[in-house]
Amino acid sequence: MFEGKNLYHPFLGAKAVKNDFTIKDDNYYIITGANMAGKSTFLRSLGVNYILAMAGMPVFADQLKISRFRLFSSMRTTDDLTHGISYFNAELIRLEELLKFCRESAEGKCRKKSGEDNKEPLRTLIILDEILKGTNSLDKLNGSRKFLEAIAKQPVSGIIATHDLELSKMENDASGKFHNYCFEIDLGTDVTYTYKIQKGVARNQNATFLLNKILEKY
């Protein structure tokens, strides 16, 4: 369980837009939104404040209630030309590490100390920012859906930011584990960012709009 009131990223200071958010055990939150709308910063806010709380440090929220769990994030995957690892291959390696991490947590292996016979399982919270970017759109969607369906069978909760609006259809899954949230923008003569999370699926995108703004100059 994770319940934050007026939570924000510590690096933003006074200009931060604060958000409320609750994560329930065995539930998954698919977050959509335009570029620069606040998805990645929000994911980091959740992770950073959890780590601060577990370290006994002040948190950047009016209120934060948490359960004890293991945290796994995948935010900035990079390729490795030196070792012949492409971006997509690096993503697969990271997702395999995640699966192993979650299994070990569920089996209690991560907490087993030398000489102890008992194992104490621990839940996992995963924070994923736009997985499988290194492949085409359809392959990415199918792969992401298959991965989430598999991970949902384990004692795991997750927050997944994505540009794949089709992935939001997982909310209709019979399990009831998937929930849609978004960061919406307003498009007028310019783009207005609210940075406030809300229920639902993002309706507006800004890539073409902003590109047209650039093209108008030339």
Predicted feature residues:
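ATPase nucleotide-binding head domains, primarily ABC-like/P-loop NTPase cores
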Residues: 2-218
